[in-house]
Every structure is written in structure tokens, then in C-alpha cells.
Curated annotation (Swiss-Prot):
The keyword Cell membrane applies. It is found in: Cell membrane; Endoplasmic reticulum membrane; Lysosome membrane. One of its GO terms (molecular function) is volume-sensitive anion channel activity. This is Volume-regulated anion channel subunit LRRC8E. Non-essential component of the volume-regulated anion channel (VRAC, also named VSOAC channel), an anion channel required to maintain a constant cell volume in response to extracellular or intracellular osmotic changes. The VRAC channel conducts iodide better than chloride and can also conduct organic osmolytes like taurine. Mediates efflux of amino acids, such as aspartate, in response to osmotic stress. The VRAC channel also mediates transport of immunoreactive cyclic dinucleotide GMP-AMP (2'-3'-cGAMP), an immune messenger produced in response to DNA virus in the cytosol. Residues 1-22, 138-264, 334-795 are cytoplasmic. It comes from the Eukaryota. GO terms for cellular component: cytoplasm; endoplasmic reticulum membrane; lysosomal membrane; monoatomic ion channel complex; plasma membrane.
Length: 795
């Protein structure tokens, strides 16, 4: 016996693979099982029963030319009915071994090969059919993709997010009709995900409305774990799509195995139809065995001929049906564009218009899935939709960022407003809009922000920062923010990415923009019109502009502070500055300036000027600052200024002068005539001495001389009795004057990094100077008298 279980490895496949088997493959599979049973049954009979039984022929030698067994054929019987002889039996004088020998010899020589090997051929051909059908499920290059696809498909089908997404869309589509019914509640079927309700369910709702209303819909429940699983599914689908759409090995393999089955079908059909008649019940056998048996002619009976002929015709019938399925498969493969798959019907049904069409092997597998159940493709499409993914991300964000967690991040910013700062999130949590106490919202590196209508709940919002965070603002929210928002900071790689709605916030007081102009637009430096910003007082622009944007003049009547940071790009045209009549503060930082622009001298209301980090070498134009009668703060730091001209004495109103990080070696004596000066910073230069005239600065409160080459200080310096901060660190001082006792207001003194051997005892007379305000080496401090140290350490 041949156990059928031995053939399981050819027929058994993973149950999950059934989703990739269309009806013709299923039919072909059953046909192969039937053909295999025919072959196994025939082989079993062939092995367990006698194959052939032979008897010697007693014909005369005169009739030796006639075929043996002729008299046993049906036509012989009909012709010789009248001439039958009555026989009482013949003795052959053969023993059992001779009969067995003759049977085997005639089986091998006289019986046609088709009759001998028919059942084996059936088994072999059927196994080849099975291998061809399941080869792409076993071949490593295709099976890995199929297994991965089926794994993802099953998870997508069973995911609670699929049901929720389809149900939400269904609810939106039926929202209108349902809203008009006061007594009928629509129930969404979770199992199918289609959002349709059967007639029986509708009747139940009509009969028991109270019961339906009290039960919350299951589709609205999605816990955090399920949300994370759905998020992982989206990533898997994306990577799988990119991987599978690259080639068409699955499509090609399926075509090849189908073509091979068709060719084999024709070959089997032809030779079976030709040789099936070779299966006969009586077989004439002529062998030269007269010396052994005494006979050379035998008449043999093929015992299974009758059964084999019936099995052969049955097998041919199954093969014909099998071949028809293969031909239909070829028609289906070449008649339809199987390398392209459109989700058009799914988009129309679900309303998810962003579901993309797919191609190559991905499309082919989806076509096969549709032959099994189109619901699989519909539910799988949910994970191809970016809208669906964004909804899921939003839901996960809301789970992760609860209102209590967001409140823990609230803190006061530099402007004193209660600020919520969020950085590098996949989206903006809806729970943000539940914090009505938020006054400032800072969003950094958050992709594709879309402000919902819930923005109107932030009634105290006055400041908004968008740092590399593109944001869409609906019209209703624009109206809400138009008169409410006071400060907005926007930062992008390029300024053209700045949302246009920013320039329509008419209540805005401060606008901070950061981003580069494209190289072809940098020279023109065109900025959106600022005419709508009627309340704008502060404008900050960090870019690579070649000139001051012309739109700055749109706010010339009320702009009070302008800051231009050019990141080293040279600012060539500044004529637009002349129109800023009420400008109080001007910053031109890293603008590549080599001279002080003349346009600045036209700003009569200017109070503060910052020219930090430019290429200024000479400041002879400083004389023209006398036209800026209100100028009180001048910052010329981080340049290459080698000297200060004597005209500095003309700046009578100047209160703060910053000249640090330059190349100064001396200071003019005329600097002492700036009697209103309160702060002077000349640190990080190359000063070797100070003019005694600095003692005339009776209003001076802060003097920074650190990181120079000073070897001594003029005694006149200690006439500045209002001096509170004196920074002398990292110079070449060898001694410190005892006249420091005259500085009664001194509260901070830096002497670290000099060549001092001792500190004067008079430091104890500086009533405002404490140990915390004295920056000096520990050894020098310990060298002070104990009573001086005790006095300085008193609270």
C-alpha cells in the first residue's frame, strides 16, 4: 500500500495563504487531489494484484502466422458460432514457476508501456501540477514577500483602528440624514466596518431606542496600546509598499507557472488520447521460450485493463477541466492590467481621497485578494491613507499628552507670559486647547500643524512661536487671532515658507522672522506686504537679504524697533531706513558693514544702535551721530575698530558705549567729555593704558576693562564715585591702588588673572563690596587682614 499521508508535503500549505487563492486555483487544487487519488489507487492495484496472466497457445504450426488469442476476441466469436468444437480441456504440462516466468516476461515485452505505467504517470503529472501551483509559495524570493504581506494584511484587517476609521467616515457620510431623526438612532456595525445597518437592525432600533442610546459605541474606544500597535502597522505598510513596488517577481512567477501548467496540460491530453486505446483486456505474446516451456506463443489477460481504461477516461476528464481553469487564468492575467491597482471605489466609499494607487507586485497581490474577498483591500487601504495616519497620530498624541502632563510644562518666558513649549512632536495634541490659561505657545520641529476650531478656547493666548513648524490656520481661527495675538515668532529654512496668514494679524505688535531668501531672490529681498499690521512696533528679520526689504516702509509710521541679522551676508542698500521716522532701536548684526551707514543719521528718534559683528575698521562717521540727539546706547562691539576718533565728545547724550572685542590700543582723552556715560565696555581689546580724563565721567557706573594689557591704572579713575562695577580681570596689573576706598558704591570688582601680589587693605572701606562681589584668586583674598575679610563676609 502507498500511504496518502506521504503526499501531504505537496498539498499542505499555510492556511493563511488561502487569501491569495482565487476560485480557479481552489478548483484546480481539488482537481489535483482527485487526480492524485486516481494515480494512488492505480498504483496500489498495480502493486498488490497480479499484473498479467498468460496461457500457452495450442495453435497448429500452419496457423502460426495468426495472432494468438484471435479465437478469444469478440469478432471471432461471432464468426465461428456455427463451428464451435466441444473441448474437454488441454494439458499444458507447465509448472507454477514456468507460469510465473511467462507472466513476467510477457508483461515486460508484450504489454504496451502506457498500460504498464499509466498510474505512475498520473501520480507524477499530478505532483508536477501541485509543485507548479505552490512553487511561488515555497520559492524564497517570493514566499518571503507573500508571508510578510499576509501577516500585515491580517493585522490590518483585525486592527481596531481600521474599524474606527471606517466607522468615523461612515458616520460623517450619514451625519446629515441621522441628524433629522429625533427617535431613531443609527447603529454602526463593528464587524464589517462598512457603517451600514441591516433592515433587521433598523427595526430593532425603532423598537428599542432607549437601549441603543444608553450603550456607547464600541468603535469610539481605542486604548493607548491599540493606538501604538496601529502606529507600528502604518510604518510596516509604508516600508513593505516601498519594498514590493520595486519589482514584479510575484507577477512574473505566477505567469510562468501558469504557462508551464498549460503546456503540460496539452502534452498530457495529447498523449493520453493517443495511447488510451492501448489498454486492452487480451494481449498476444510471442516469445522464444519453446526450449524452456515448449511454447512460443501465449495468450495473456491484463487483469486491470478494464478498470484502468475507466480510470484513464476519468483522468482525461479531470485534466480537461484543469486545463480549462489554466486557460482562464491566462486570460485573466493578460486581459486585465494586474500591475496597477486603483483604490478609486474605496476612496469614493470611505471618503479618504488620499489613498494612493499601487503598482507591480503590490497591485497584483491586491487583485488576488479581491478574488477572495474585496473587504480585505478596503480595510487594508486604511493604512495607506495619510489622513487616516494623521488621525491616529492625533489620537495617540491625545493619549500621551494629557492636560495634567501639559500643565507641568508651563513656565514663564522672558516676556513674563505663561508659556507652553512643545518640541519635536508628530503633531499638536488637541488637549493643548483645554489649557485656557496659556498666554504663549511655542511649537518647535512639529510637522504639518493644523489648528482646529478649538483654538478659540485659548482666550489668553497673546504669543505664538512656530519654529520649523508649518501651520495651517482656518479662516475662523484667523479671525480669532487677528486682534488677539501680540507677538509671533516664525523660523523656517526659507522665508517663503512663512504662512501668509501671519501678515494679516492686524493686532500684532512684534513680528520675528527667521529664514533665508533663495539665492536668486536674496538681492531683491522681497517680503510680503506689512500694511495690515497696523499695531506693529517690533520687527526682527534674520536672513541673507541684500537690502532692507521695501515692505518695511509699510509700518514706518509706528515701527519702534528694527532688527536685521544677516548671518554675514553683506547688506548693500539701506535707503529704506530713512523713512522710519519714529524708529527708536536699530540692530544691524552681521550685515557685512565696513562703514557706518549714512541712512542711520537721518533717524532723529533713534535711541539705541547695535552694529555688532560687522567689519567696521573706522568710525570717523561717529561725528554725524550728533544729529541723533536721543541716542543713548551705542554698540560697536565685535568689529575690527582700531581707534576711537576725538569726535566722540560730541555724543553728549550717550549713556552706554560698547566697544568690546575690537582692536583698540588706546582711548582718546575726549572720551572723558561724554559726561552722561553710565556704562563703558572696552574689554577684549589691546589697551595698555587709560587716559586720566576718564575720571571726569562722574555718572559712570559700569566699567569693563577685562582681557586687555593694562599694567597700571590712573589714580583719576577712582574719582568716578558712582562706579558700581569694575572689571579688570586678565590684565597685567602688578598692584592695585589704595584709592579704591573712594568707590563707596562699588559692589562688584574683578581682579582675577593679573600679576598682583597683594590686595590693599582699603578694600574694606568699600561699604558695598562683599566677598561674593570680589572675583580674585583665593590666595590673594586670604592675604587680606582678618578684620577686612570679616567685614566683607558680613551679610
Amino acid at each position: 500500500m502507498i500511504p496518502v499521508a506521504e503526499f501531504k508535503q505537496f498539498t499542505e500549505q499555510q492556511p493563511a495563504f488561502k487569501v491569495l487563492k482565487p476560485w480557479w486555483d481552489v478548483l484546480a487544487e481539488y482537481l489535483t487531489v482527485a487526480m492524485l487519488m486516481i494515480g494512488v489507487f492505480g498504483c496500489t492495484l498495480q502493486v498488490t494484484q497480479d499484473k498479467i496472466i498468460c496461457l500457452p497457445s495450442h495453435e497448429s504450426r500452419e496457423n502460426s502466422s495468426e495472432a494468438p488469442c484471435q479465437q478469444l476476441l469478440p469478432q471471432g466469436i461471432s464468426e465461428q458460432i456455427g463451428g464451435l468444437r466441444e473441448l474437454s480441456g488441454l494439458k499444458n504440462n507447465l509448472d507454477l514457476q514456468q507460469y510465473s516466468f511467462i507472466n513476467q516476461l510477457c508483461y515486460e515485452t508484450a504489454l504496451h508501456w502506457y498500460a504498464k505505467y499509466f498510474p505512475y504517470l498520473v501520480v507524477i503529472h499530478t505532483l508536477i501540477f501541485m509543485v507548479c501551483t505552490s512553487f511561488w509559495f515555497k520559492f524564497p524570493g517570493t514566499s518571503s514577500k507573500i508571508e510578510h504581506f499576509i501577516s500585515i494584511l491580517g493585522k490590518c484587517f483585525d486592527s481596531p483602528w481600521t474599524t474606527r476609521a471606517l466607522s468615523e467616515v461612515s458616520g460623517e457620510n450619514h451625519k446629515g440624514p441621522a441628524a433629522g431623526r429625533a427617535t431613531v438612532t443609527t447603529v454602526t456595525t463593528v464587524g464589517t466596518g462598512t457603517g451600514k445597518v441591516g433592515e433587521g437592525e433598523k427595526e430593532k432600533v425603532l423598537i428599542e431606542p432607549e437601549k441603543v442610546v444608553t450603550e456607547p459605541p464600541a468603535v469610539t474606544l481605542l486604548d493607548k496600546k491599540e493606538g501604538e500597535q496601529a502606529k507600528a502597522l502604518f510604518e510596516k505598510v509604508k516600508k513593505f509598499r516601498v519594498h514590493v513596488e520595486e519589482g514584479d517577481i510575484l507577477y512574473s512567477m505566477y505567469i510562468r507557472q501558469t504557462v508551464l501548467k498549460v503546456c503540460k496540460f496539452f502534452a498530457i491530453l495529447v498523449y493520453n488520447l493517443v495511447y488510451v486505446e492501448k489498454i486492452s483486456f487480451l494481449v498476444a505474446c510471442r516469445v522464444e521460450t519453446s526450449e524452456i516451456t515448449g511454447y512460443a506463443s501465449f495468450c495473456c489477460n491484463h487483469t486491470k485493463a478494464h478498470l484502468f481504461s475507466k480510470l484513464a477516461f476519468c483522468y482525461i476528464s479531470f485534466v480537461c477541466v484543469y486545463g480549462i481553469t489554466c486557460l482562464y487564468t491566462l486570460y485573466w492575467l493578460f486581459h486585465r492590467p494586474l500591475k496597477e491597482y486603483s483604490f478609486r471605489s474605496v476612496r469614493e466609499e470611505t471618503g479618504m481621497n488620499d489613498i494612493p494607487d499601487v503598482r507591480n507586485d503590490f497591485a497584483f497581490m491586491l487583485h488576488l485578494i479581491d478574488q477572495y474577498d474585496s473587504l480585505y483591500s478596503k480595510r487594508f487601504a486604511v493604512f495607506l491613507s495619510e489622513v487616516s495616519e494623521s488621525r491616529l497620530k492625533q489620537l495617540n498624541l491625545n493619549h500621551e499628552w494629557t492636560p495634567d502632563k501639559l500643565r507641568q510644562k508651563l513656565q514663564r518666558n522672558a516676556r513674563g507670559r505663561l508659556e507652553l513649549s512643545l518640541c519635536m512632536l508628530p503633531g499638536l495634541p488637541d488637549t493643548v486647547f483645554e489649557l485656557s490659561e496659556v498666554e504663549a505657545l511655542r511649537l518647535e520641529a512639529i510637522c504639518d500643524i493644523s489648528f482646529p476650531p478649538g483654538l478659540s478656547q485659548l482666550v489668553n493666548l497673546q504669543e505664538l512661536s512656530l519654529l520649523h513648524s508649518p501651520a495651517r490656520l482656518p479662516f475662523s481661527s484667523q479671525i480669532f487671532l487677528r486682534d488677539r495675538l501680540k507677538v509671533i515668532c516664525v523660523k523656517f529654512e526659507e522665508l517663503r515658507e512663512v504662512p501668509l496668514w501671519v501678515f494679516g494679524l492686524r493686532g500684532l505688535e512684534e513680528l520675528h522672522l527667521e529664514g533665508l531668501f533663495p539665492p536668486e531672490m536674496a538681492r531683491g529681498a522681497t517680503l510680503e506686504s506689512l500694511r495690515e499690521l497696523k499695531q506693529l512696533k517690533v520687527l526682527s528679520l534674520r536672513s541673507n537679504a541684500g537690502k532692507v526689504p521695501a515692505s518695511v516702509t509699510d509700518v514706518a509710521g509706528h515701527l519702534q524697533r528694527l532688527s536685521l541679522h544677516n548671518d554675514g551676508a553683506r547688506l548693500l542698500a539701506l535707503n529704506s531706513l530713512k523713512k522710519l521716522a519714529v524708529l527708536r532701536e536699530l540692530e544691524l548684526v552681521a550685515c557685512g558693514l565696513e562703514r557706518i551707514p549714512h541712512a542711520i543719521f537721518s533717524l532723529g528718534a533713534l535711541q539705541e544702535l547695535d552694529l555688532k559683528d560687522n567689519h567696521l575698521r573706522s568710525i570717523e562717521e561717529i561725528l554725524s551721530f550728533q544729529h541723533c540727539r536721543k541716542l543713548v546706547i551705542l554698540r560697536l562691539w565685535h568689529n575690527q575698530i582700531a581707534y576711537v576718533p576725538e569726535h566722540v565728545r560730541k555724543l553728549r547724550s550717550l549713556e552706554q558705549l560698547y566697544l568690546s572685542h575690537n582692536k583698540l590700543e588706546t582711548l582718546p582723552a575726549q572720551l572723558g567729555q561724554c559726561f552722561g556715560l553710565r556704562l563703558l565696555d572696552v574689554s577684549h581689546n589691546g589697551l595698555r593704558s587709560l587716559p586720566p580724563e576718564l575720571g571726569l565721567l562722574q555718572s559712570l557706573q559700569h566699567l569693563a576693562l577685562s582681557y586687555n594689557a593694562l599694567e597700571s591704572l590712573p589714580d583719576e579713575l577712582f574719582f568716578c564715585h558712582k562706579l558700581r562695577t569694575l572689571l579688570l580681570g586678565y590684565n597685567h596689573l602688578t598692584q592695585f591702588s589704595p584709592h579704591v576706598a573712594a568707590l563707596q558704591a562699588l559692589s562688584r570688582l574683578e581682579l582675577k588673572g593679573n600679576r598682583l601680589e597683594a590686595l590693599p587693605e582699603e578694600l574694606g572701606d568699600c561699604k558695598g563690596l562683599k566677598k561674593s562681589g570680589l572675583l580674585v584668586e583665593d590666595t590673594l583674598y586670604e592675604g587680606l587682614p582678618a578684620e577686612v575679610r570679616e567685614k566683607m563676609e558680613e551679610e
